[in-house]
Every structure is written in C-alpha cells, then in structure tokens.
Amino acid sequence: MGEGAWLVAFLVVQRLAELALAQWNTARLRAAGGIEFGAAHYLLLVALHSLWLFGLWMLGHDRAIDPLWLAVFVLLQAARLWVIASLGRRWTTRVIVLPGAAPVARGPYRWLRHPNYVVVVLEIAVVPLALGLPLFALVFSLANTTLLAYRIRVENQALAWAALATSNGGSVKAGTVANGYASSFAKSVRTAKNDLRHTNR
C-alpha cells in the first residue's frame, strides 16, 4: 500500500474505535438520565465523515504524505486524546447532557468552549492537504463547517439547559428539560409565523 493508504486505514480504525467508545458512553449517559439534543442531524454527520474517508481512499491511497502536514496531523491527534481524556465518560459523538451536572472545565475546556470541534475542523482540512488534495480539503471543509455550525447551536442550547438544571439544584427532570426545549422551539416558530403574517399585510 502507498503512504496515503496507511493514513486512511489509520483513520478508519480510529473512527471505529471512537464509535465504540461513544456508544458505550452514550449508553451510560442515558442510563444516568442524560438528554440527547439534535438527534436528527447525527446521521448527516456520520454520512459526511464516511464520504470524507471514502473520498480520501479513492483519491489519496496511492499518494505520498507531506511531512509538514503529517506533523500537524500528529499534533491534532494528541489534542483529540486530550479532549477525550478531559471529558471522560461524558465524551460521545452525540449531543447529550446530564441535567444538574456542571459543564466540564478541565483540560482544553478551561480556555475553549468547543475544543473537539476545533480539532475536527482542522483535521478535515489537514488530512487531504497532507495527501496533496487542496480542492478536496476545501469542499469538505465547507460542508463540515456548515454542519458543525448547526451542531454548535444545538450544543449551546443543550448546555444552557444543563446550566438551568444546575441552578435548580439538579431538580429539573429529564422530561422538563426536553419539553422546555420543545416549547422554546415552538414559541420561536409561532413568533416567526406572526412576523411573516404582519409583513404580508
């Protein structure tokens, strides 16, 4: 196999290992009363990363790896492990919060709100650049940024509800959180409809 093939093979094994860990943590979080937000977008996220890996294999399996970009990639893997270790059992590929649990404030979370997404954004671009695929890097960076922008909005909502539960001494029930989120969304829709109705008058 070429250098590119070894790199993509490493990424596939890494992603499978992360999915296994994420499923384990997700089950534990749900058993502890965790609430999932934005579940509908999860399959899109999986599809995007699957297409990214498939495209890297098809276009880059026989390419050499640029040593400079490879060094950046290695640093990103160290940052990824730091994030996972900092979140511990709360690390997952889904957006899940525990009502009443304080946000993680150790590791890179002392300085960044979403360090994991910083790693993902950079990795999506760095790997194809390491294989000499700048257009591929641009296309998937744009797609990934669009999807992450939505995911970050969802996660910020989830963190806001977690903070609400914490301020109530952990007394906010799972159903209350979920219903409150749904009510907030429904209210936003009604407001938008009313604004549109007034505009058309």
Briefly describe each language-model feature range.
Residues A39-I65:
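Long, highly hydrophobic alpha-helical transmembrane signal-anchor segments
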Residues A22-H41, A64-A192, L196-H198:
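Cytosolic-biased juxtamembrane loops and peripheral soluble domains of multi-pass membrane proteins
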Residues A5, A9, L45-L48, A71, ...:
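Hydrophobic H-region at the start of alpha-helical membrane spans
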Residues V13-L16, A47, V74, L112:
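Alpha-helical architecture
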Residues V8-A22:
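N-terminal signal-anchor/start-transfer transmembrane helix
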Residues M1-E3:
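Feature marks short, highly hydrophobic, charge-poor N-terminal signal-anchor/signal peptide-like helices
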